[in-house]
Amino acid sequence: MNSKEVTKGVARAPHRSLFYAMGYTPEDLKKPLIGIVNSHNEIIPGHFHLNEIVQAVKLGVASAGGTPIEIPSIGICDGISMNHSGMKYPLASRELIADSIEAMTIAHKFDALVLVGNCDKIVPGMLMGAARLNVPAIYVSGGPMLPGKLKGKKIDLVHGAFEAVGSYAEGILSDDDLNKIEQHSCPTCGSCAGLFTANSMNSLAEALGVALPGNGTIPAPYGRRKQLAKYAGVKIMELVKKKIKLRDILTKEAFKNAIALDMAIGGSSNTTLHLMAIAHEAKVYLTLEDFDEISRRIPHITKLSPAGTHHMVDLDEAGGISAVLKELMDANLIFKDQLTVTGKTLEENIKNSLVLNDSVIRPLNNPYSNEGGIAILRGNLAPDGAVVKQSAVEPEMLYHKGVARVFDGEELAFDAIMNKKIHPGDVVVIRYEGPKGCPGMREMLSPTAAIIGLGLEKSTALITDGRFSGGTRGPCIGHISPEASEGGPIALIEEGDLIEIDISNRRISLLVSPEELSKRKENWIQPPCKAPDGTYLKRYSKLVTSASTGAVLE
């Protein structure tokens, strides 16, 4: 065991003394030391309750013969950091989380890890750190919040407070209407109620095999959530005894299973970044081509918010992620023999699962669409690729040709949208928002939600080298690579250019001649980094790679 390096032998008497200072006993130090990574804080609704989840994990570990030791992790709320300079930090924090887990685990010689997180960048950051270390590990989420209810209808943070901002600006909502919506959009703790990035990643963790069945959908307030956490504490001890490490589970086939699930449920476009980043740490080669190939053959069979009216609690009641995976397995669309943290194969985990509501989980022969939720676009505007959540695009906007309205930053675009300077048919271009250029690759939820609130989602597209919240819907193409700050074609767009978007044929094109683009490229000057000297973001901008490879650090 790794922990023997700090607990055994005469030379480790000082180390044991430090443990005894905290109340650990000699008997505790003879057991495997299990690091419980707790990302609880009092600023993220999805993490506010995690101390309760961690206590359940600890009980499970102790009951199975281990010594649980809690260590902290940071966590940023994408919602609260949205639409201001703070949004430069969430994606960049993913790497901080991975690095801090590496540092804490190696410094203290933990034998295994239970990773307790919930929200957007915390999930991949934790899995990246554990994959890098290649120790036995299990991921446990805090679970989704329940949707709100107002005037007999279910609402959530996106189909509620965010989209209400645009509706208020349009004069559709009164002050009282807006106040009621913001009071009712988030009624409980937990990750936001729809299939946004947090719940997408928590669900994909089941398909990857790194979390127990139910991890993605059991609501945060339910007792079953604490039961799952306790079982995870027991299971980590089994993994230690069987010497099953995370990379034994995180194979190429496991990632393909996760992508297949992603396509079937219509997960967040951010999953492309995060799965590639986790794969990078697990030494698995994963590319945008893997997403595109799998998307073309996996039907889209659930339509949760923001694309539809169902929420995570509805998916849970319909059979959960296990039921979706069972549908895919029965059609030979996933690899069923993959090892999971239960110590069993994926097939053994899900073989008895049933779809309990086929209006929430449709059969494969009656999908919402024959292709998966995410499409990868290419063309002269995105030679290295771009990403769109096609499952959340209205059919009439799968093809669009429009005039470019160019903005060098989110704030300028948002102001133009709110001041009604964007018109039907336009293509809003928000650039210099990529991993290097921002730096940090901000999410554009506020502009996209404002477009919807103004009723423009069936006539106006938005493209960016930034990214989108999992709550974004509509014809929004992100992750355009190369990014503007690297001299990508998006930097060469001029006001009034024509842009053609053809999602069905996976194309995005700037309708400008190659000769004109070459001339513009010669005159392009790379802007300086916007991050102040001495900051983490300045260092991040020097090391981060393209969104087309997961925005990992070199």
Swiss-Prot record:
UniProt keyword Isomerase present = no
Keyword Transport in the entry? The reply is: no
GO molecular function, one example? 2 iron, 2 sulfur cluster binding
Recorded hits in SUPFAM superfamilies, A to Z, give: IlvD/EDD N-terminal domain-like, LeuD/IlvD-like
Function recorded in the entry: Functions in the biosynthesis of branched-chain amino acids. Catalyzes the dehydration of (2R,3R)-2,3-dihydroxy-3-methylpentanoate (2,3-dihydroxy-3-methylvalerate) into 2-oxo-3-methylpentanoate (2-oxo-3-methylvalerate) and of (2R)-2,3-dihydroxy-3-methylbutanoate (2,3-dihydroxyisovalerate) into 2-oxo-3-methylbutanoate (2-oxoisovalerate), the penultimate precursor to L-isoleucine and L-valine, respectively.
Q: Which PANTHER family match?
A: D-XYLONATE DEHYDRATASE (PTHR43661), D-XYLONATE DEHYDRATASE YAGF-RELATED (PTHR43661:SF3)
**Which NCBIfam families does this UniProt record tie to the protein?**
ilvD, PRK00911.1
Protein name (record): Dihydroxy-acid dehydratase
Species name:
Clostridium novyi (strain NT)
Q: What is the lineage of its organism?
A: Bacteria, Bacillati, Bacillota, Clostridia, Eubacteriales
